[in-house]
Amino acid sequence: VPVLAGLGTLAAMAGAHPASAADLRLIDFAERLVSPEQIKAAGFDGALVYVSELRPGATFDFKPVTREFTDALRANGLHVVSCYQYGKPGWPTPSDFTRGYNGGVADAQTALRLHGAAGGPETAPIFFSVDEGIDLGTWKSAALQWFRGLNSVLGVERTGVYGSNRTCAWAGGDGVIGHSTTPGFRWAWQTKAWSGGEREPTAVLFQTEVVTDTDPGALIDGVHVDVDDVLAADFGQWDLPR
């Protein structure tokens, strides 16, 4: 993984052309926590942190994120972005988007509580995961209802999505995710998974390396992590006033 040549300042990010944001890279956690000092030393600019509970049977140490950890990220000059995922395909707790409107209400309430407890500002978005390759029928019949439940608690403008290029596009088209302050961008975090090499042009983040059984992702001090390219000056980071 290329090492970045230093951290962008908030002032530079806020005033930069969106193209310049491509020099920033974040990580998100797939195995276990990496210390803020290690993240910074590896040349990354921040992390996506989980404002969700640990699902039964999982042993991750990064859910939910703690105030101590986010304070340490910020003390090291690193950006923080909130995301949410509880269930997962193949687990007793299925994908969150299958929980319908009422499930969306409950998940947003949990996310909001944990985001606040970790020090997250009231203006920052939270990205909610659709962690599988769904089709349009599943989006319309299930995921869309869940997102509307999320919206009822958070408001559209604080709701974001993680998923394939198509999932991100559907969420934007149906008006259930908010807008970055960078013109032309939405709260969409696209993963390369299930995207077939296609890109969603409104996405503020692109998950370019994903830890799987066949792909180790990036290594920081022996820990495998996912890697995310920043595509817009406002990518949902806590430290940007909105």
Where are each of the predicted segments found?
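A short secondary-structure junction signal
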Residues: 138-142, 171-174
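N-terminal export signals
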Residues: 1-18
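Functionally critical loop-and-helix segments that line ligand-binding/catalytic clefts
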Residues: 22-32, 36-37, 168, 173-242
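Acidic, His- and aromatic-enriched active-site or binding-groove loops in soluble protein domains
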Residues: 103, 107, 144-160, 176-200
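Post-signal peptide N-terminal regions of Sec-secreted extracellular proteins
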Residues: 20-23, 41, 71, 75, ...
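Aromatic-lined carbohydrate-recognition surfaces of secreted/lumenal glycan-active proteins
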Residues: 155-171
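Substrate-binding cleft of extracellular glycoside hydrolase catalytic domains
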Residues: 23-34, 42, 49-138, 144
